[in-house]
Amino acid sequence: MKLLIVFGLLTSVYCIHKECSIQECCENQPYQIEDPCPIHYYSDWFIKIGSRKSARLVQLCEGDYGKRIPIHYQMFGNYTISCEPLEINCQAPPVGSLIVRCSYDYDFVEHHDVRVVLDFV
């Protein structure tokens, strides 16, 4: 129990200093993630592998908006169920952290990233 409290506090402190979204879901159940990007912004979902700012981003969906489909990677199993809106199997990302990239432009020239933290119920 103490470990959960400490983890919750560390996550909250991390989210205060960086843009972050905390969402609750039932573990190992399908979950439609709430998009933290502002209205009228495009969003693209990634798994960030590594903790550095320059860490590699692995894209979860591909295709044009309105016709996006999940990319299934062997190392992630069936993590991504659908893309519009994003639906995943509620579990911690197999590696790294879940990131959504928000941009007002379709080409994502200017963007900001939001880390999505899942709290399991």
From Swiss-Prot:
InterPro entries: ORF8_bat_SARS-CoV_HKU3-1-like, ORF8_betacoronavirus, SARS_ORF8_IG. Residues 19-121 form the SARS ORF8 Ig-like domain. Residues 1-15 form the signal peptide. Keywords: Disulfide bond, Signal. It comes from the Viruses. Pfam families: bCoV_NS8 (PF12093). Disulfide bonds join 25-90, 37-102, 61-83. The keyword Transferase does not apply. PROSITE patterns: SARS_ORF8_IG. This protein corresponds nearly to the fused 8a and 8b proteins of SARS-CoV. Bat coronavirus rp3 is highly similar to SARS-CoV (SARS-like). This is Non-structural protein 8. It comes from Bat coronavirus Rp3/2004 (BtCoV/Rp3/2004).
